[in-house]
């Protein structure tokens, strides 16, 4: 028998040799076939060869063995493999020299590193070559004894165990279901129930007994490796002839290559740290063939079984079918490249009059406006298709306007001669400044013009005279802060040439243009477009309005791609795979056929590791897409860029493209120094931009974003950003959007698991399919949301750049729309202020702009900036569960309607200037002392303009009015349109108009907008609040509705009925005369119908909503707003229980049935939790490690950090932990046994620690119940009668007494009538008083001195016969209670009340926690580090005041009389009330405290103090 030892460093050599061997012709001899005697002679010759000169027999020697014989590493089980002395073949007579300098009586280092069984005995001489020569040969009998001993050692394990050395780890990995994300991996790995220590110990004893019973029952007769098979039984096979040896050798190597190499390579790819040692015994022909075939069959069966198991368990993309895609490529990319390369030789397709029809898509300026490029498409008749074309515009000129400085007279009061002299003085001063300070500006032209102004600088609104200056754009612009003696400031110095070009040529979005006198570019092209032209004058560009406007818009080419990334050893993200879909027929005005796509996938090896052995073969069998494999990342990215250039897409589409994908691609391009990287865009560049902002130029829309600089000429479509603008969802990741919008399932993917998917071809193909389907879902989402046609319509309305509409730059859209309108009316336009790096972030415009809808300020430094003015009104909700229909009435575009209703515009609202001439902010004289400069400004309240004012110059209302009329016209067309395609186009257009109109208000309050007018924005929101309050008053007092909630522009009313049609009729009543008589432009209508509603707090509710109400196809769906049920710091069990409780509450069942179902379900959950009936994965909590472990100041209160610290101590790299989610569970025992009261972090464990502890670590079930299960349930049942926290706690099996306090707080002053039937109609009967009593800190309790009955003091009350009774009588024994005792109780009650208030205790919002403290922590965090919620003031000013008012109500006899008169009860005078004097004296005590309180007082002198100061001035 011969052993071939394959160590880690030799596996690649073996694999490469096997490939080399397969390529050699069989006629050539690779091996020398010799017998044992000849081989022994060769070994002796090697040992005798003294190949180191003059070393005196020391140091270097050759043992005569082969390279694969070194067995310095232990095998599995800690045993060393014995060296065989018999060999069959040799690669080549290479010498393996081992350096060692030996001192006398010392052994060699080789002997030191060898196993003990192979080290020479102390008596043996090892350093003399002469003695090595005299080594005696081993006899045949001794060889037999040695081989028998070897077999006995090898057969100590069964054959299956020997095979496990090679493939057990692989089979274990393959049998696992494919997990694309960490949650799936945790679920599949830890879906096991935990065992107690006793169960583990009992199981261990049982296994030992069974193991002992199986000793001696091995199937040795059928085992070819049985230890009973002696050396004699196989000795005859060793004397086989040369042909037999050759046949055995070939079969052995073939099996080795096919089986062992596959297993070992997969192991190394799965885990590079696995130490693989393969062992193959050379046997006779039949035995060897049987063994290897059996091993191979076993592996194949195991793998096939695992594949079947995997595909059954893992439906990763159910519902997605790519069958409609063309199986054949649309075009061969190489042929396509050759054809398109010839387009440069084609002439320009000029019209008969010599003009060129050019459809423009994008534009870009370089070098501070010197170079202006327009990108678009032209029709190439030779190719019968549209090709890309670039146009460079020369001859642009800057336009500046200088405002003359007034001296002595007001503007408009000068004579014509004085105006001429004033303008001449400005001209001379500016020309002098040009010559001295700006010699680069060689010449310019000037002339006086009349322009209007209506913005925020201290310039009187109206028409004034300006000096207009024009000069070539190749000269530098003047600074915006320049001022002189004769002029105040200069407008237009920061305006980009692209913006000026769009405004001057009146270009509103992508359209056909007629180009006059175009010149084709043949040499030194600056772009990657197929064609290029140059024009010398911007006036040669005209928007086509008539003939060509009827021409259909050219189709666009899109390239949709998706990445898979991996983490490199240097802790950097690398791209491992790119899948792309190509579509050459994207429609601009309607839906596109996304099924006709060509796909290709590029992938590379991971860190040089081999691919699966059969991957190339299976790639050839796949015909539906193109898969290309590369050796490294650079080759793959270069191929990707090359294909982008060949395809030349107009649209580059991806999900979350702007959120990191493109940044990663550019980072890898820069790091790997990829060639021709600028082909990603259409403008040739040599240096990769490395700054987020381009401060060097006045680029369009301010500074530029890096991906924009790289991809100019192509449009970036990020479905993540577009979805945020077009749909309102709780999440915008691809998985959620695919499920909600496309009704298709997708599995999340974690990059950490990517190496495990490179093990086999099946797994790798599943990863390829996942990546390709991500791209397919992305383009489907783009088509489903109509992103292309919708953003095109938005761009055509606003007149901005298309790429900015795709980036959700709503503020910029509004800017451009207003710029077009004000430019048309000859207004001086406000300058664009340069943004700062800290303000320029991805989606900056969208984020800040969105916040202005609710009156919130933009984010600053990661925190919300305090609102400079009040936002929308939120009516206090009447929290509770409503099981009848709730109507949601909503104003149609409230803020735009207010602008039209009151004619609000820059030109009509009188306000103070907010900017100086140098652009700095004017310090507000209304700002309170000590107020921060950036926060808390008191905005001047402007007055509504007179409605009778001329509205011709009111630009903003006219723009909105025009948009509303256009939308109405489109809706009218939709009613009569029967063509589905045209109907879809009209729907997209009316939606675009609506989005534009609704966002116009935002530019007024957006601080970075050029049209920022805070006073107008504050006036609009104030009017909106007044409108909502007036609507609520009409609904309640005139229409008799019960308004339960209101927010900004909508109210919820309780219809009190369960009939849908009846509730809809009620919803039409507010649309009647009541509101129409008040407003002309404001309209209110039904926006939603809720079958049932669980209203908890502001902006937090859950409901069953009628979808498509008013139609026969109406259905009920569940809608949840603001209820955070998917936080990662809740374990899956908590989420499941919370969802079940919510579904039961909204189910519509009877209250008794709901309580019964909850009791049964929660009791079952509690029982399973205590009896280990729930799998471990349901208890796992995950939380992200956002920074390095050392940066966390306190680890005790952060369990995930403590677990990460232990993982790091166990050898896991910190780079693999940071920014990843750490899973953990909470155990019942502390991690450090020396701690008696450990923090939560001391009880946190990684799930693997729990599984490997064998029952030593148990979960803290009580903690999970109190901190994970109870809190979400408590918030849901807080306002539901019949269900309280005590009930839930009892169901879950915990002590309900702990939650008695929270349950009592929930009750709203219910009175116990079991013993006293006298309390029938207490005085606190109105809804206000009942809510007041429920908001009190405590109620006045007294104890009867006669019968010792304790009860809440009722004050003045009536019996059932309307007889007024005094509260000074005991409700049980009816004995009088002394007045002095009542007064003493009132005094003590007031003292305790004020003491509680001034203590200022803070209490945690979490009922299960309830921690109370007087400490003030950052951000009001709970003092309990294990808790996640915040503290609230326990006894607030409002509660204290409500309690005092409650006491007043107990003793206020006059109010009692008034209430009785309202209710039609018996009229009594004050004197007729029993114990009137006593009640008056006790009320006086309360009144004294109320008078000293300033909570319910308004200091008018401080409010109107500014008027007093104004008079003094």
From Swiss-Prot:
Enzyme nomenclature, EC number: 2.7.7.7
InterPro entries, alphabetized: DNA-dir_DNA_pol_B, DNA-dir_DNA_pol_B_CS, DNA-dir_DNA_pol_B_exonuc, DNA-dir_DNA_pol_B_multi_dom, DNA/RNA_pol_sf, DNA_pol_a_cat_su_N, DNA_pol_B_thumb, DNA_pol_palm_dom_sf
UniProt xrefs under PROSITE patterns: DNA_POLYMERASE_B
GO cellular component terms listed in the entry, alphabetical order: alpha DNA polymerase:primase complex
SMART domains for the chain: POLBc
Catalytic activity, reaction form: DNA(n) + a 2'-deoxyribonucleoside 5'-triphosphate = DNA(n+1) + diphosphate
GO molecular function, one term: DNA replication origin binding
Positions of the UniProt region annotated as Disordered: 235-254
Places the protein is found: Nucleus
One Pfam family, short name: DNA_pol_B_exo1
Chain intervals annotated as zinc finger (CysA-type): 1344-1373
Chief subcellular location: nucleus
Motif (CysB motif): 1404-1427
One GO biological process term: lagging strand elongation
UniProt KW keywords: DNA replication, DNA-binding, DNA-directed DNA polymerase, Metal-binding, Nucleotidyltransferase, Nucleus, Transferase, Zinc, Zinc-finger
Binding site for Zn(2+) 1: 1344, 1347, 1370, 1373
Keyword Lipid biosynthesis: no
Binding site for Zn(2+) 2: 1404, 1409, 1422, 1427
CDD domains the UniProt entry points to: DNA_polB_alpha_exo (cd05776), POLBc_alpha (cd05532)
Role according to the record: Polymerase alpha in a complex with DNA primase is a replicative polymerase.
NCBIfam families according to UniProt: pol2
Further remarks about this protein from its record: In eukaryotes there are five DNA polymerases: alpha, beta, gamma, delta, and epsilon which are responsible for different reactions of DNA synthesis.
Assigned protein family: Belongs to the DNA polymerase type-B family.
Protein name: DNA polymerase alpha catalytic subunit
